[in-house]
């Protein structure tokens, strides 16, 4: 009944007309994608504090004023790149089968994050003193996706605990922050530099140590 009342009182909605982007709009979007790819790589290697707008513009191959047509500040640029990262993480989370054990879902998402790190696509986490932290907090799209991400991972952690896969004495926050930290762990690079392991082997070793320890 309530749904019927809402439907009856709502004005008829005309189907939206999908406007095809113009050539200029496609160019603008392609340039923006290139900018964010460069930013993602710089954040993965140097971090936010050492990144400069001059460096981004030079690597993309555009003038600095052109860069500011897309992003009016370094903070907005980094916040947009981090938001895209969370979008990719949420795609991985949503790809996990509902009937899959929670611990397996956590492992699968960690594998994705570790692989992204080894491929140079995982930005370094901002430190507690980094100036990007406030910019991220003020960027609504980032906060919205971060809440979705932490809610999903938090539910898996609680379910895995109920299933006896995670120690009851370990707080949920510690488990979650540990998973986040593993995605940016320099151990990945150290293992790769030995030349003894493939990327796939490194990922599995890290997952094993994270969830099973050294025993």
PLM-predicted stretches and their roles:
Residues 1-46, 50-59, 76:
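Basic, helix-initiating cap at the start of DNA-binding domains
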Residues 30-41, 45, 58-59, 76-96, ...:
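Alpha-helical structural segments
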Residues 79-80, 187, 215:
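Short, Lys/Arg-enriched C-terminal cap helix and immediately downstream tail that follows
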Residues 90, 136-163, 173-177, 181, ...:
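Amphipathic alpha-helical packing segments from all-alpha helical-bundle domains
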Residues 1-19, 108, 112-115, 151, ...:
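C-terminal peripheral helix-coil segments that are non-catalytic and often amphipathic
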Residues 61-71:
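Short hydrophobic/aromatic patch on the recognition helix
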Residues 116-137, 188:
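Amphipathic alpha-helical segments used for helix-helix packing
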């Amino acid at each position: 009944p309530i749904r019927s009342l809402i439907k009856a009182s709502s004005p008829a909605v005309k189907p939206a007309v999908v406007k095809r982007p113009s050539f200029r709009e496609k160019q603008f979007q392609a340039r923006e994608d290139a900018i964010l790819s460069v930013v993602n790589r710089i954040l993965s290697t140097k971090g936010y504090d050492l990144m400069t707008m001059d460096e981004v513009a030079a690597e993309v191959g555009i003038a600095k004023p052109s860069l500011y047509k897309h992003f009016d500040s370094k903070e907005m640029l980094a916040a947009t790149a981090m938001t895209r990262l969370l979008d990719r993480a949420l795609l991985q989370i949503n790809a996990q089968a509902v009937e899959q054990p929670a611990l397996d879902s956590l492992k699968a998402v960690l594998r994705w994050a570790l692989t992204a790190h080894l491929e140079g696509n995982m930005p370094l986490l901002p430190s507690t003193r980094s100036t990007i932290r406030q910019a991220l907090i003020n960027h609504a799209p980032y906060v919205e996706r971060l809440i979705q991400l932490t809610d999903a991972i938090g539910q898996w952690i609680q379910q895995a605990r109920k299933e006896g896969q995670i120690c009851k004495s370990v707080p949920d926050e510690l488990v979650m922050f540990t998973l986040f930290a593993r995605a940016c762990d320099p151990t990945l690079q150290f293992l790769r530099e030995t030349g003894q392991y493939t990327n796939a082997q490194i990922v599995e070793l890290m997952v094993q140590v994270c969830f099973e320890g050294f025993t």
